[in-house]
C-alpha cells in the first residue's frame, strides 16, 4: 500500500525547482562568443546601426570596430551609402553629410517616404567634386581648389576620421580624378605651359604616385583646361576662347572617357594609349556617370542614356513626374551617381516656397532596358533631405561608398 508523501517532504522536493525558476535568466546575446556576435551584426543592414548602438556601450564598441566592417566585406554584406558636401557662400570648408536610405522601400501614390538618415560629418579643406573619388570604404580628396596643392586627404567612412595621404608628384588646382582597377588617374590642374605634368596615376596598393607621359594624349587634349562643367576663358586670348574638356567620373569598360571640344577620347590603362572614339563630341552633358557600361547624364533638362551605336542621347522613359512636378520638378540634376546599380539624382526644385531657403531633393531610380533603344526608370525612393540657404552651392562633391 502506497502512503502519501508528507507535506514537508513535498515542499522539500519542490522548493529547489522554485528557486531555480526564479534565479534563471534568458540567455543574452552578449553571452555568445565575440566572433559569433560580430558575424550576426555584420549581416544586419547598417541602416539599423544607429539604433543598435544605443542598446549598450558594448554594442556601440562592436559597431565601431574596424573588424566588423572587414567582416562585412568578407561575407559580402556591404551596402552603398551616399556622401556629399555643400559649399557655403563665404567659401569656408564645405559641410560633409552621409545619407542612408532605408532599404527595400518604394514610392507609393503621390506621397514621399521619410525613412532616411542624414548625418553631418567632420569636414576637411575645400574640395571640388571632380577631385573626389571613392575607394572602397574611403574617400580621396585630391589637390587644391582655389590654390594649387599636391596634398591628398583621405576620409575613412568606417571611423569618420580624416588623414593625410601621399602627395602627388606636382601641385594641382581642381584636377579630375577617376578610379580604374584600384588606381586613381588624375588629369589637369596645371597651366598651359606645364602640359608635360598633365597626367599622373596613384597605385592604391603600393600607395605611390607615378607621372604618365602626357604627350601621348596629343595637343587636342592637353591644350584644353580641365575644368568640368564650367566655361573658363584662357588668359591672354583676345576672343576669350573656351578651352574645356569633360571627363567621365566613372570608368567605361575599364577605360577613361574624355569629351573634348571636337572629339571624344578613351584612355586604355593597359597599354597607355589614347584613341579617338568619336568625331562628334558629347562634351555638353552637365553631369554623368556609368552603370553597367552605359553612360547616363542630365542633358537638356532630362535624364538620358547614351546609345553608342546611334551616337545619340536618348531620354530615360517613365520619369515624367520627376521632371515636370509643380513643386519638386527640376531644371537639371546637380549630381547623378551609380548607387549599387541604380541611379541616384540630387537637385534643387525649379520653384522654391521660401525666399532665402531652398530644399535639396534626392531620388533613387531603378533602371530597366526594355528594348535595344529604350530604357525605363522607376522611382523607388524620393524625398527632400535638407534645407539650405539659396547661396549654398549644391553637391560640391558627391560619391557613393561601399561600407
UniProtKB/Swiss-Prot annotation:
Protein name: F-box/kelch-repeat protein At5g39560
SMART domains the UniProt entry points to: FBOX, Kelch
Gene Ontology annotations for the cellular component aspect, listed alphabetically: chloroplast
Kelch repeat boundaries on the chain: 138-182, 184-229, 248-294, 296-340
PANTHER family for the chain: F-BOX DOMAIN-CONTAINING PROTEIN, F-BOX/KELCH-REPEAT PROTEIN SKIP4
Source superkingdom: Eukaryota
F-box domain segment(s): 26-72
Cross-referenced InterPro entries: F-box-like_dom_sf, F-box/kelch-repeat_ARATH, F-box_dom, Kelch-typ_b-propeller, Kelch_1
SUPFAM superfamilies: F-box domain (SSF81383), Kelch motif (SSF117281)
Keyword Repeat: yes
Keywords per UniProt: Kelch repeat, Repeat
Amino acid at each position: 500500500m502506497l502512503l502519501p508523501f508528507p507535506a514537508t517532504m513535498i515542499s522539500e522536493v519542490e522548493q529547489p525547482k522554485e528557486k531555480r525558476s526564479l534565479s534563471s535568466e534568458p540567455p543574452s546575446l552578449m553571452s555568445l562568443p565575440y566572433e559569433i556576435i560580430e558575424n550576426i551584426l555584420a549581416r544586419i543592414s547598417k541602416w539599423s546601426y544607429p539604433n543598435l548602438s544605443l542598446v549598450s556601450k558594448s554594442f556601440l564598441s562592436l559597431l565601431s570596430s574596424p573588424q566588423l566592417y572587414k567582416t562585412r566585406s568578407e561575407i559580402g554584406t556591404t551596402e552603398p551609402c551616399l556622401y556629399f558636401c555643400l559649399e557655403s557662400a563665404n567659401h569656408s570648408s564645405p559641410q560633409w553629410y552621409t545619407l542612408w536610405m532605408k532599404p527595400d522601400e518604394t514610392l507609393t501614390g503621390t506621397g514621399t517616404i521619410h525613412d532616411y538618415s542624414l548625418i553631418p560629418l567632420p569636414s576637411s579643406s575645400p574640395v571640388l567634386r571632380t577631385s573626389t573619388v571613392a575607394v572602397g570604404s574611403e574617400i580621396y580628396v585630391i589637390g587644391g581648389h582655389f590654390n594649387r596643392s599636391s596634398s591628398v586627404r583621405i576620409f575613412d567612412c568606417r571611423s569618420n576620421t580624416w588623414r593625410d595621404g601621399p602627395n602627388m608628384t606636382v601641385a594641382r588646382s581642381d584636377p579630375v580624378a577617376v578610379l580604374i582597377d584600384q588606381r586613381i588617374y588624375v588629369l589637369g590642374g596645371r597651366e598651359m605651359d606645364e602640359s608635360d605634368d598633365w597626367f599622373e596615376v596613384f597605385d592604391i596598393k603600393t600607395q605611390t604616385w607615378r607621372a604618365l607621359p602626357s604627350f601621348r594624349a596629343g595637343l587636342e587634349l592637353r591644350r584644353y583646361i580641365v575644368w568640368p562643367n564650367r566655361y573658363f576663358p584662357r588668359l591672354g586670348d583676345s576672343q576669350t576662347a573656351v578651352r574645356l574638356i569633360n571627363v567621365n567620373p566613372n570608368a567605361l569598360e575599364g577605360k577613361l572617357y574624355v569629351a573634348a571640344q571636337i572629339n571624344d577620347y578613351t584612355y586604355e590603362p593597359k597599354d597607355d594609349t589614347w584613341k579617338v572614339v568619336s568625331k562628334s563630341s558629347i562634351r555638353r552633358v552637365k553631369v554623368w556617370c556609368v552603370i553597367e557600361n552605359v553612360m547616363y547624364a542630365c542633358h537638356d533638362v532630362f535624364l538620358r542614356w547614351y546609345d553608342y551605336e546611334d551616337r545619340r542621347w536618348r531620354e530615360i522613359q517613365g520619369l515624367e513626374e520627376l521632371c515636370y512636378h509643380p513643386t519638386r520638378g527640376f531644371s537639371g540634376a546637380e549630381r547623378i551617381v551609380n548607387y549599387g546599380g541604380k541611379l541616384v539624382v540630387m537637385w534643387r526644385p525649379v520653384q522654391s516656397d521660401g525666399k532665402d531657403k531652398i530644399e535639396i531633393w534626392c531620388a533613387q531610380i531603378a533602371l530597366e532596358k526594355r528594348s535595344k533603344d529604350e530604357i525605363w526608370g522607376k522611382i523607388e525612393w524620393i524625398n527632400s533631405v535638407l534645407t539650405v540657404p539659396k547661396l549654398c552651392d549644391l553637391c560640391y562633391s558627391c560619391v557613393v561608398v561601399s561600407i
